[in-house]
UniProtKB/Swiss-Prot annotation:
Protein species of origin: Rickettsia africae (strain ESF-5)
Role: Participates actively in the response to hyperosmotic and heat shock by preventing the aggregation of stress-denatured proteins, in association with DnaK and GrpE. It is the nucleotide exchange factor for DnaK and may function as a thermosensor. Unfolded proteins bind initially to DnaJ; upon interaction with the DnaJ-bound protein, DnaK hydrolyzes its bound ATP, resulting in the formation of a stable complex. GrpE releases ADP from DnaK; ATP binding to DnaK triggers the release of the substrate protein, thus completing the reaction cycle.
Protein's recorded name: Protein GrpE
Keywords linked to the UniProt accession: Chaperone, Cytoplasm, Stress response
Source superkingdom: Bacteria
CDD domains the UniProt entry points to: GrpE
Gene name, Swiss-Prot/TrEMBL: grpE
Amino acid sequence: MIDDNIENNEQTINDIAEEIVETANPEVTALKAEIEELKDKLIRTTAEIDNTRKRLEKARDEAKDYAIATFAKELLNVSDNLSRALAHKPANSDVEVTNIIAGVQMTKDELDKVFHKHHIEEIKPEIGSMFDYNLHNAIAQIEHPDHAPNSIITLMQSGYKIRDRLLRPATVQVVKKP
C-alpha cells in the first residue's frame, strides 16, 4: 500500500511536471525563436556595419588618390611644354642658353618626380605596338605596308594616368588596312 501510494505520488508528480512543461513550452519556444531572430538581426547588422566601414574606407582611399586628378591634368600641359622646349634646344649655344636649358631640364625632372610621387604615369606607346582604345586616341589613320593594321605609327602626344584612372589618352596615328 505504501508502495502504491509512492507510485501514485510519483505519477502525480510526473503528471504535474509534464503539465507545467506543456504550459511553459509554448512560452519557451516563443522565447527561443525570439532569441534566434535577435541573433540573426545582430549578425546581419554587424555585417552591414562592417560592409559600410569597408565602403567608406575604399571611398576615402579613392578620394585621396584621385583628389589631385584635376590639378594634375592642368600640369600635363606644363610638362608637354617643357618637353617641347628641350626637344628644340639649339645645337651650338653660348653659356647663358646652355644654363637656361639646364634649368628647364631640372624643372622637367622635378615635375616628373612629383608625378611619380603621386602615381602619375606617362603613357608613351612604342611605334608598332597595337592601338588600345582604353589608353590611346587615334587622330588619323595612315596606310603603311610595313606595319600591321591598328598598330601605332606615330606618337603625337603622350598620355597620362593616375594609378588606374586615365588622365589623358596618348594621341597617336594608326595604320589602317590597305
